[in-house]
């Protein structure tokens, strides 16, 4: 029996490979944040960002598997070292929110291009990424709102750290 083979444009293959690279880069960024947080004594936040790092690898796997299922060889990306010059838990919370906004824009582009090409299978996967981004934006926005609402003194930051650990 012949293997299932489906046409997918070079543009969408490129975007799927880009998705892999961005998800793996996100994983490394969140790992760098987790390491910094742990080093600075924010053990709860470190656990949560470690969890985020693992989730991003799972998201990369979706794209790897999708391309493999279409009999397309995915590209394993070469990645630069992630940002690691963090200054505070607050800095990390805001950086996470901005990063998730960027990832959302990238997922929207994938969905828009898949729609333009009437590639509804790729659009379905892009929608899955966008559904995930709704959750990611809500999570990062929650922490931004906590800081904006309650402030940034040490007691509040310790409470946020503890709450992050509870959510890990």
Model regions and ranges:
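Iron-associated oxidoreductase/ferritin-like identity signal
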Residues: 1-168
């Amino acid at each position: 029996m012949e293997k299932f083979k489906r046409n997918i444009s070079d543009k969408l293959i490129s975007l799927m490979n880009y998705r892999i690279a961005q998800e793996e880069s996100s994983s490394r960024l969140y790992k760098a944040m987790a390491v910094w947080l742990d080093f600075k004594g924010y053990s709860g936040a470190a656990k949560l960002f470690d969890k985020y790092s693992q989730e991003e690898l799972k998201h990369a796997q979706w794209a790897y598997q999708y391309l493999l299922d279409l009999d397309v060889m995915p590209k394993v990306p070469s990645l630069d070292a992630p940002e690691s010059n963090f200054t505070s838990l607050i800095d990390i919370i805001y950086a996470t929110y901005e990063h998730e906004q960027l990832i959302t824009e990238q997922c929207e582009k994938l969905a828009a291009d898949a729609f333009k090409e009437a590639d509804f299978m790729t659009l379905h996967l892009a929608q899955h990424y966008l559904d995930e981004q709704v959750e990611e934006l809500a999570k990062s926005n929650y922490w931004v709102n906590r800081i904006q609402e309650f402030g940034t003194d040490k007691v509040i930051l310790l409470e946020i750290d503890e709450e992050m650990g509870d959510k890990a």
